[in-house]
């Protein structure tokens, strides 16, 4: 199951999407920017950050998956746990973990998760 697709969907509607056992993706709206000297305008956009300290299941992601997949909440929780297990394994093997329409996760030298958001998706 590609839970990153569900995370991306939820990030359009909510400021915080917690992935139990991994961390939380947080959004912040960045105002439009005007640079008069360059005649440049950039529209408002959402910026995505990641907090590895927020790991408890708040139910948002699991409920969303259960509704979308027409399955039980318990099955959705177990699917998330399985995916998180695989993600952590990939990170520990020094892999970059791309999450479609969200960004990339990797471990730094101190084994902390580092998140790099994709800028092309608003």
Cite the ranges covered by each PLM segment:
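Cytosolic/nucleoplasmic/matrix-facing N-terminal domains/tails
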Residues: 1-122
């Amino acid at each position: 199951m590609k839970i990153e697709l569900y995370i991306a969907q939820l990030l359009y509607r909510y400021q915080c999407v917690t992935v139990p056992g991994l961390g939380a993706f947080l959004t912040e709206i960045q105002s439009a920017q005007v640079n008069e000297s360059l005649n440049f305008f950039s529209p408002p956009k959402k910026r995505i950050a990641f907090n590895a300290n927020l790991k408890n299941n708040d139910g948002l992601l699991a409920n969303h998956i259960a509704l979308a997949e027409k399955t039980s909440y318990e099955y959705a929780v177990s699917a998330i746990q399985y995916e998180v297990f695989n993600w952590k394994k990939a990170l520990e093997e020094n892999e970059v973990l791309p999450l479609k329409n969200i960004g990339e996760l990797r471990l730094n030298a101190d084994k902390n998760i580092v998140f790099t958001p994709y800028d092309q998706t608003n």
